[in-house]
């Protein structure tokens, strides 16, 4: 029961953080790419790699931080929505492929770097 509460609290903080980052970047920058989603996913990938690399052994930490906070921070569903919305009558294959590659390849690299720090 405690782990469920930790996931809920961590997820709430992660979602609030994602919302704040999204609002900030949407107001500060104009781009054809959804920069905010890219940033939260890259930060989340780096942090999960860091968590794996540090082998944090605090019993409550994975539920709160990994499943909760990082689960609330990162977002695959928003990525899927953004990629779908790119497939409009003005579809730009280069934009679509670049954004996809940035998300997945750079996300993996961020996780790898976090793991090896």
Curated annotation (Swiss-Prot):
It holds the Pfam family CRCB. One of its GO terms (molecular function) is fluoride channel activity. GO terms for biological process: cellular detoxification of fluoride. It is a multi-pass membrane protein. Na(+) is not transported, but it plays an essential structural role and its presence is essential for fluoride channel function. GO terms for cellular component: plasma membrane. The chain crosses the membrane at residues 1-21, 46-66, 95-115. Its main location: membrane. The keyword Nucleus does not apply. It comes from the Bacteria. The keyword Phosphoprotein does not apply. Keywords: Cell membrane, Ion channel, Ion transport, Membrane, Metal-binding, Sodium, Transmembrane, Transmembrane helix, Transport. It is found in: Cell membrane. Coiled coil: none annotated. It catalyses: fluoride(in) = fluoride(out). Na(+) binds at residues 71, 74. Fluoride-specific ion channel. Important for reducing fluoride concentration in the cell, thus reducing its toxicity. Belongs to the fluoride channel Fluc/FEX (TC 1.A.43) family. HAMAP family: FluC. This is Fluoride-specific ion channel FluC 2.
């Amino acid at each position: 029961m405690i782990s469920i509460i930790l996931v809920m609290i961590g997820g709430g903080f992660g979602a609030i953080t994602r919302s704040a980052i999204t609002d900030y970047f949407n107001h500060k920058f104009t781009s054809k790419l959804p920069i905010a989603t890219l940033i939260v996913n890259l930060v989340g990938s780096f942090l999960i790699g860091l968590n794996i690399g540090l082998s944090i052994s605090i019993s409550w930490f994975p539920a709160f931080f990994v499943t909760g906070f990082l689960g609330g921070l990162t977002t695959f569903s928003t990525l899927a929505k953004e990629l779908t919305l790119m497939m409009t009558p003005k579809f730009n294959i280069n934009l679509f492929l670049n954004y996809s590659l940035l998300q997945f390849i750079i996300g993996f690299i961020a996780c790898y770097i976090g793991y090896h720090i």
